[in-house]
Amino acid sequence: MHGGLKSTLVMLTHKIGTGIKVVKDFDRSLPEIPAHPAELNQVWTNLIDNAVQAMNGVGTLTIKTYREDDHVVVSIGDTGPGVPENLKKRVFEPFFTTKPVGEGTGLGLDISYRIVVNGHGGDIVLESQPGDTRFQVRLPVAEPSST
């Protein structure tokens, strides 16, 4: 998983630019998880790209991994303006975007939600206030049961 996060950061280096500080706080003791790496790389790309855009070239992007009970958590945070309370419930809706026309399709977070929840049996949660927005992706350590 850490390899996918690192490769996503490399891929987005030009977009991240020099005004955004990247903080990586990776728990190296995390177990391997049953996952589709290419799909998760799409999630990391969507979340990191959104965070970078929210900060408008200046701020701190924090990527943290840790274990919480029977899940591995990837937290991607930014120091942008935050998501207004009245929009938090809508961010995972298909075609919902706060970006200007032509700059976003409103599908990135919907796709990310489907990959994490439907494809991996995990969860993705938004916590946001001005200066501290975090998407927390929770992925099960074990295969989801098919019962």
Give the residues covered by each predicted segment:
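Core catalytic ATP-binding domain of two-component histidine kinases
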Residues: 1-147
